[in-house]
Amino acid sequence: MKLQFLFIFIAFCVMLFAQIATAKPVEAEVAQSNLDECEVEAEVAQPKLYQRGEGGNGMEPIPEDVLNEALNA
């Protein structure tokens, strides 16, 4: 019985070591680089202001010249 327990314990330790040895830390680096790219895209993206479209249907972006005029007034 003790021999069986010892064998199971050794097998468990070997499997645990194999899991640790084959862990992929690269995935964490890829995830971090993807997060960095998202942050850069969020910084670059500029929000657009919308106004009601002609005839009251839908929304359309406010033209930049009109927006700049309103902001500078």
Curated annotation (Swiss-Prot):
Protein name: Salivary thrombin inhibitor XC-42
Gene Ontology cellular component list: extracellular region
Tissue expression pattern: Salivary gland (at protein level).
Location(s), subcellular: Secreted
Keywords linked to the UniProt accession: Secreted, Signal
Native source species: Xenopsylla cheopis (Oriental rat flea)
Subunit: Interacts with human F2 (thrombin).
Function recorded in the entry: Acts as a competitive inhibitor of host thrombin.
Disulphide bonds in the chain: none
Signal sequence, renumbered to the chain: 1-23
